[in-house]
Amino acid sequence: MPAPIDDLECAALDVASSLELTSLAMKQCADRLRSNSTTFKSALRLLIRTADRPGSKIVFTGVGKSYQIGKKLAATFTSVGTLSICIHATEALHGDMGVLVPGDCVIALSYSGATEEVLRMTEHIRMDKRVCVVGMGRSSDSPLGALCDAWIDSAVASELSDSVNAPTCSSSLMLAIGDALAVLLMNRRQFGPADFARNHPGGHLGRSASQGAM
């Protein structure tokens, strides 16, 4: 049985503390990036090269929560001008790797760096040097890191719960890094309100973008 919430004020403060912990994870990642960006710049170089090459695309992959993050990021990248898709690593091993073409860049999402399906997919990609792989997760010193051309550090000190190690801070950080990359590529290509209005005509965002482009 769930424990009764006797004190809603305490519950609200618990949520506030969780938000602060998530924010701290992002700040710590930003601090690491400011102090040493060498590895990150290698990943940026590959992503920019892919985004600038006509016909090439950025392909996110993962399983579980990482796959859900990849789907969201692929949608964001595409909506702001960088062609992107997301494929499930398991489905990739059963035919979906056919979407990869020379010049693509795969962003493999695995916080542990040891997700079996992602490793198998990456190993298969490594047989074809015409597609590069950027990993994102806790440590480049991992089975996935050893297979990648570049690595994006998304390590966190802890998740929100000490007892249940569900992806929380780590998944939020992955998402935030991906959004930041999408905006970086958007700004490089001078993608503006008129471009966004063409890609996103529906809903409140579409109406606002259309008005801003006038």
Regions found by a protein language model. Name each.
Residues 146, 160, 187-214:
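Internal, active-site/partner-interface "lid" segment
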Residues 30, 34, 185, 189-190:
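Secondary-structure transition/hinge residues
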